């Protein structure tokens, strides 16, 4: 959404569909009795008293995690559902039986807070640097994309195919194995508890990547590469240059985003409803004792989990989309694709037996977004936002853990207490939702899909129109005609430019992050707006009285107006070049082109200075008979020179971005 690949509404629909399908149709039908192995009660099994405590403990853990996730999502913090529930389980385990906590497993989870975002950032950084070097630095980026995209699609979709099987379809393969349809060892990475797991050879029994999964992933890669080649061959691009390149990456990003949503639904949702399956197992058991090993996950629980995540995405999902898509760094389709590919590759690596560390897809994706931002320089990343996100990750375990202890105490093993506490929690949550700020779809869409350089370009066009109207006013006055119409239009156009500027300032102030620093961008915007301000001053100066009645002086004035307009036109080309520079990931080629545009603006401004000096000299040499009119003509020339000078300063404000 932040890259503009999909509108907010369409993104919500796509995410909801793939999350739901992943959870319901490919989620695991069997789950561990103690989620992720963070609790270990020994090999003696569970007695009735312990099972009942665990049932209420799991209820408390789920409620605590749900409240924490609600609070975090309300403030747009992308926290891990799985880790929040694990935190709740750890808390209730400490309270019920302190020595039951498997601290080495907890340590693995804590390590994953650093390891998965870090690796995701590195892979996303490298991915985008390769895209930038191979495509954006090329003289003809669109043609380069058409020729290379099918080749790049093969390894990309091969990795996605493996990650989909090992992360998203893991539960599905286990279901088929339980039903005697397949042997899961032939499809999933080998289990370190059963094999040595030391071979890359797909034909080995201890292969990290089994032959079946390898062939399926290769088939997916070949099919995707072939389809992309055919589509690019037939598709008639309306966009040129970098816009056309981003059009290709929009397709790729949508596919990778669908994978992330599907894998999250298939794996993470199943993890989230694991404690609920344990509760159901205890409550439905005739003995009231928890199964010691595995429990079945009823289909209605998978439906419940899928429905829950669908509602979550459709209600407050936009808040997290806003944070990841706009507030961390500037995202385009190519950057978004690199981030999602980096995240998918990280998930694949951590699913290998030589690591086998439980990681969060959410944490990994955030790290990948930071990595893509760093590819454009440290200034492109808002580390304050990332710091808040990281703090929320660290807080997930203790907050959910303490919350589960509190709720477990309030439950007191009494179903009536459970009903009262849960009901009050639901009422409070609904109240918070109702009290949430109402957000208009259109304004929200514009904020989340906001592209600052697009808006900057829109403001530049408004400024250019203001100067063009000012030029018409000057020519009209110089010809002895009434310039009132053009004067009024100039003032109105300057007001429109101010409105656009204020809108941009408001959105930038709301936390949108992009390729250069916020202060630098606002300085550039302010410099650009002064061009329109000075054009308005020229128009107002014309309204004071008629021009100096001298033919050569008036011709000089029109020549000056033409020079000023040419300076503004050159500045507009520099703005176009700045936009291209941003789209290219600040490639060296576009830096050189922008530098040439800035030099051209400076040359045009110097030419305007020369004409202004010539025109002023003529006015002062011939204006003795009507000194007041001559002084008025000089004031008009000065204000016009201000417009040209403002163009020069606005263009020079682009230069710091060339040092990135």
Where are the language model's segments positioned?
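Cytosolic, long alpha-helical scaffolding segments
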Residues: 441-660
């Amino acid at each position: 959404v932040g890259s503009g690949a999909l509108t907010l509404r369409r993104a919500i629909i796509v995410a909801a569909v793939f999350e739901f399908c992943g959870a319901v149709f490919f989620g695991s039908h069997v789950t561990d009795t103690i989620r992720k192995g963070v609790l270990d009660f020994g090999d003696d099994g569970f007695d009735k008293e312990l099972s009942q405590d665990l049932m209420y403990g799991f209820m408390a853990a789920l409620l605590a995690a749900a409240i924490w996730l609600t609070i975090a999502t309300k403030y747009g913090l992308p926290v891990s559902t799985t880790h929040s529930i694990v935190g709740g389980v750890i808390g209730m385990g400490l309270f019920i039986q302190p020595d039951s906590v498997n601290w080495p497993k907890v340590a693995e989870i804590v390590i994953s807070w650093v390891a998965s975002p870090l690796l995701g950032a590195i892979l996303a950084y490298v991915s985008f640097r390769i895209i930038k070097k191979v495509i954006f630095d090329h003289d003809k980026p669109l043609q380069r994309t058409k020729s290379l995209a099918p080749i790049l699609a093969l390894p990309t979709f091969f990795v996605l195919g493996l990650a989909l099987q090992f992360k998203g379809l893991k539960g599905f393969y286990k279901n088929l194995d339980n039903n005697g349809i397949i042997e899961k060892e032939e499809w999933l990475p080998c289990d370190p508890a059963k094999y040595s797991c030391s071979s890359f050879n797909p034909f080995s029994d201890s292969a990290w990547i089994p032959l079946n999964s390898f062939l399926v992933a290769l088939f997916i890669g070949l099919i995707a590469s072939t389809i992309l080649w055919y589509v690019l061959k037939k598709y008639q691009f309306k966009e040129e240059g970098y816009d056309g390149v981003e059009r290709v990456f929009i397709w790729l990003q949508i596919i990778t985003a669908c994978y992330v949503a599907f894998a999250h639904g298939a794996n993470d949702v199943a993890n989230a409803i694991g404690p609920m399956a344990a509760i159901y197992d205890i409550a439905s058991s005739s003995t009231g004792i928890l199964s010691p090993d595995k429990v079945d996950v009823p289909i209605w629980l998978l439906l419940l989990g899928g429905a829950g995540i669908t509602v979550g995405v459709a209600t407050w999902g936009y808040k997290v989309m806003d944070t990841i898509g706009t507030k961390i760094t500037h995202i385009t389709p190519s950057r978004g694709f690199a981030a999602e590919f980096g995240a998918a590759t990280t998930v694949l690596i951590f699913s290998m037996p030589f690591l086998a560390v439980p990681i969060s897809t959410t944490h990994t994706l955030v790290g990948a977004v930071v990595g893509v931002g760093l590819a454009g320089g440290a200034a492109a990343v808002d580390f304050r936002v990332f710091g808040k996100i990281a703090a929320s990750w660290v807080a997930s375990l203790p907050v959910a853990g303490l919350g589960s202890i509190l709720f477990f105490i309030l439950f007191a093993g009494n179903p009536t207490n459970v009903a009262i506490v849960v009901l009050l929690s639901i009422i409070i949550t609904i109240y918070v939702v109702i009290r949430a700020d109402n957000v208009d779809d259109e304004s929200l869409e514009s904020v989340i899909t906001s592209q600052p350089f697009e808006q900057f370009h829109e403001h530049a066009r408004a400024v250019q129109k203001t100067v063009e109207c000012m030029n018409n006013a000057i020519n009209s006055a110089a010809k002895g005609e009434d310039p009132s119409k053009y004067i009024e239009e100039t003032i109105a156009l300057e007001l429109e430019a101010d409105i656009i500027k204020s809108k941009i300032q408001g959105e930038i102030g709301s936390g949108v992050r992009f390729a250069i620093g916020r202060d630098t961008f606002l300085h550039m915007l302010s410099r650009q707006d002064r061009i329109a301000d000075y054009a308005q001053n020229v128009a107002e100066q014309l309204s004071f009285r008629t021009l100096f009645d001298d033919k050569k002086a008036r011709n000089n004035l029109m020549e000056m107006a033409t020079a000023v307009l040419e300076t503004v036109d050159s500045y507009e080309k520099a703005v176009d070049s700045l936009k291209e520079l941003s789209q290219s990931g600040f490639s060296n080629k576009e830096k050189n082109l922008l530098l040439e545009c800035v030099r051209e603006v400076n040359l045009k401004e110097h030419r305007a200075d020369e004409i202004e000096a010539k025109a002023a000299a003529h006015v002062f040499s011939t204006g003795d008979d009507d000194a007041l009119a001559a002084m008025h003509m000089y004031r008009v020339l000065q204000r016009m020179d201000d417009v040209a000078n403002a163009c020069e300063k606005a263009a020079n404000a682009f230069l710091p971005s060339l040092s990135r």
